[in-house]
Structures are given as C-alpha cells and as structure tokens.
Amino acid sequence: MSVTVYVSATLRGFVNRNAKLLAEGNTIKDVLCSQTKKSDIIPDGYIEYETEPREYRLNSISTIINVNTAIEDVYSSPYDQVKEQLELAIESLREHQESQLINNDDYGLLKNVPDSQRIQTRNGAPTPDDLDELITKVWKEPSFFLAHPRAIAAFERECTKRGVPPVTTNIAGGTFITWRGIPIIPTNKLLVDGLKEPKSQSGKTNILLIRTGEAKRGVVGLYQAGMKNEQSRGLSVRFRGIDDKGVASYLLSLYCSAAILSDDAIAVLEDVEVGEYYDYE
C-alpha cells in the first residue's frame, strides 16, 4: 500500500512546509509603528508561500514472523510465546525506524539539516564551546541533543578537562547529562565512521540539536493513523494464517517519516572526534 502525506494546510498544517520565502535579513512584512496622529499609510501585501510544497511519502518497514503452533501450545505458560516473539520483532522494527529517521537519504534528519545550520568543531573533540555554538542555531526552546554514546563520553572528558562537569537530569526514570539545561540523549544511530559500534578508539560522528513539536514549528514524526490491526502509532500486526506444517505467520508493518517544519528547528555539529583522551595527575 502506498501512503502519501501531502504537505499543505489541508492536513491541519501537520507538516506544513508552505514556509515564507524571505530574503536573508528581511522581515516577514513591512509594518507601521507610529505614535503620531497624522494619517500614515499602513503597508499592505501578501505573504509569499510555496505553490508546490514538498511531498512526504511514508516509509514502509515490514517483516514476517513465523511461530510454530506447538511452541504456542506447550510453552505459553508462564509467558505467552506469541506475544513475547512479536514484542521482540516490534522492538527490532522500532530500532530500524530510529535509524531511518536519522540517516534515511530522503527524510533523514542528517540529510535535511539546512546548510546554514551546520557547524564544524573548533578542534575536533566536542567542547562546551562547540555545544554553545550549536545552541545559537536552535535557541528557541531547544528540546534535546542527540549524540552517539562515544561522542557523549568525549564531551564529558572535555568538560572534566575544563573543570565544568555537566549537570544530570532524570527523564522517564533514566539519568542523562545536560548542557545549559538541555538533555543529551544517546543513540548509536548517529554513526561513528559509519558504524554503530566502532572498533577503534578514534572516529568521527555528528551531534544534533533538535526542537520538537508541531506547535513549536519543530521536528515532527509522521505516521499513518487509524490502520487496521493497529498496535501503536503507525504499526500494524496482521495474522496471515497457519500453513500445513502448523506454522503461524504474522505480518508486521510500520509506516514512518519525519519533517522539519522550520530551518531553525535543527542544527548539527559535524566532524566530531571521539578519540581524544587525557592524562590527569
């Protein structure tokens, strides 16, 4: 099934990309600000918009899980074997979804960061100064940083070197470090030299800073709501039947994409070196 999301005001502005086409340094529209009593002419005009906004297609991630009915019959106590195996498969789909949201060549966040929102590290390793520069790019209500665990460790070493250890915070029962009050969320989907788990101590990666939410014109996830056999947002599980060998089959389908609603909703720190270490006396 092909699912298409059209970026227009007709979809509740969900992924509205009819952004105002403004020249750099100009305001949205000329306005009148005057305390004089004379009859000044109030500026008028129209806001420019994209006549053919970008079209987002939902990416399909699917897999088929087979479960022998004998396993279900004999070993479903104390745990439901079908449920447990489906949950493992769903977790695998979610991991792949996370990777696609960051690295997909079409809608991935890394591929869609505007050039004006890309900055380089000062000296390779991610320093507090680098993250401060990143905040200047997403200064309107930033939600969180995204970084590989190796990049987070490299940043903590730089903080220790400068005597400014980052503060920690608790989110959903987990402890995360923060910088300037913004949590730094780990993900191995921001690859180091193209790998989730790099073999060597050195390597380069990227750090993202993101503002999320439609109301804030941030980064939003797209999914198909109201599907048949829907288990959660954008995810459906369909029973395909039992074959002659007594093997039950289930089709798992996940539809997803992402949109950046305004240029200043995301920024990236590029070429982050994770292999800088120091000796402390």
Short names for language-model regions:
Residues D105, K140-S143, T205, V247:
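Short, surface-exposed beta-edge/turn micro-motifs
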